[in-house]
Amino acid sequence: GAFTLGLPSTGIHSNGYSLVRRIISDNHLNLKETYEGFDKPLGEVVLTPTKLYPKLVLPVLKGADVKGLVHITGGGFYDNIPRVLPEGTRAVLDADKWPLLPIFSFI
């Protein structure tokens, strides 16, 4: 059978900033404050640079029979993964298998 490979997020990426700005504003959060669970101020946490993945993905594309790739953006797993699956197939994901970055629990 086939398997699903996920690459880790480094934090809030470009499509998430509008929502994060609203959450910060609505909750009167201080971007200069270091909140529990972080080792730097919130402003630095949310501005962690977006990781680019070519160095990880290109060797996989060259060495495996890749059936599909999906960029998880707005809509998350549930809206994005089905777009690359052949009709009649499904992906089974176990959310307990990957760590949740503190910023996502915080917001």
Predicted regions and their residues:
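Glycine-/charge-enriched secondary-structure boundary and capping motifs
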Residues: 30-107
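Phosphate/diphosphate-binding glycine-rich loops and adjacent basic-rich segments that engage nucleotide
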Residues: 1-33
